[in-house]
Amino acid sequence: MTVLQDVDIDIYASEVLLLIGPSGSGKTTLLHILGRLLHPMHGVVELHGKPTAFLDADELAMQRLKHFGFVFQAYNLFPVLTAAENVMVALDLLGASKRVAKDRARELLEVVGLGDRLDAYPSHLSSGQRQRVAIARALAGDPEILMADEPTAALDAENGLKAMELFRTLARERRCAVVIVTHDPRTQRFADRIVHLEDGRIVECSTLAPFPTANALHAPVSPPLSQGGM
């Protein structure tokens, strides 16, 4: 089944890029392909001008850990682990020692405003706080590209805006690109660019703020791109 067609997109350091469009337009599929969670049947994804295909499973997994950070709608926190321990899981996968992981987890939770909730379990955190733990975990590998799928969907208006403010701050201060799939029109004020998809095609790309010319990720996808059997 063809999901995306004639998609050609660059992603730049320090920018907030929104992917918008109706349900079924290919937003989440594009996000997953950019983040190497799905492999395109046609076309290529390049990181710093180098194709990311032809990697074995272990190399691909390490590339995702080192270059990409993901914040999914389901935060997938371990309920029996504290906020700090949930972040330490990602750091352990990256090879950090227990001592380094503990210190780094504290630093990352401070970055997202949870420095006082290190020992809190997910059940004792609000939805917005759980999301911030997920963001801290996504930052474990100091990613060049942070990706989020509908990050405001489960939050009230106030916390949704706080989440977007945090994403924009991370983009600017950590010089990472932030790519967000969203249906929420309130998020558009935080964007540098907005890519509008319909029926698997980019129908409009709006630039709202200047951004650097050095691109972090390039994904020309043509001929038609399929979802890999999904």
Residue ranges of each PLM-predicted region?
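ABC family nucleotide-binding domain
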Residues: 1-190, 197
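Conserved beta-strand-loop-alpha-helix hinge in the C-terminal portion
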Residues: 193, 201-226, 230
